[in-house]
């Protein structure tokens, strides 16, 4: 599963500058996906859902069944919230149920109007997911969410002022699962311990994940756990993709979910890609990852098709 949230080029910086220039970088990424028969899921925000260039570009791939288009809610760009939030990057989990449902309904309607499809896949902006959102997703026809980042605690990440930060996912599963009393499938981003203790959803994983961040946890991680995100970071290398693949195979995971922001695919639009050289490095690692996964027999599928199957 390849999940790509296309969005603003300047949202990594302070200010309210709105630019979708990084969307123009997506054809190169799409071409790489098609080279390895992988089907990306583009989870889009309100500003992308109403942009004519983005609609034309993504609709073409969607209509050819080479990509899926789903929803990605950023409260600070939602028409019903933008004036009140004034650029404050609150987590969707910090909204009331009424605020969240209105914002997601508007986004869903915009996608349906522009792309002539009803979106069924979703990710909360900034990983800001909570139980309140599950029933709303179901009411609006969504069948799959990918907002959970297992092993990660976002409570120290600032969202709403004078609030408690983001969600704590450390106790949640790595494998896909259904929320209780719900038909919405959760497909977490693949974050694995690839060291000595690599059993997925096992006792040691849960125990270590619950440890407070600090020097001791960093030492244990380096020696025994070696946590790896299925994302491209400046320090990523071929060995990371091999470790992730080996751990996934050993644990019989049904899926590996990778994600990248569209802003990380163009120069000067992300802290990870400040220069053209850094963009080329990202693409080298993407090529390495896709090649390793493809040679191992992994087959690409969109989020919603995975949920249906």
Q: At which residue positions do the language-model features occur?
A:
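Acidic (Asp/Glu)-rich catalytic clusters
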Residues: 27-37, 50-78, 138, 243-253
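Surface-exposed, active-site-proximal loop segments in enzymatic domains
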Residues: 4-14, 82-94, 268-274
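Hydrophobic faces of well-ordered beta-strands that scaffold small-molecule active sites
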Residues: 40-42, 69-73, 120-122, 144-146, ...
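Active-site-adjacent pocket scaffolds in enzyme catalytic domains
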Residues: 124-249
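Metal-dependent polysaccharide deacetylase catalytic core of the NodB/CE4 family, i.e.
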Residues: 43-124, 128, 191-196, 262-263
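C-terminal domain-boundary segment and adjacent tail
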Residues: 215-309
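Acidic-and-aromatic substrate-binding clefts and catalytic sites of carbohydrate-active enzymes
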Residues: 17-23, 43-55, 123-131, 154, ...
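Active-site beta->alpha N-cap acidic-glycine motif
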Residues: 1-63, 289
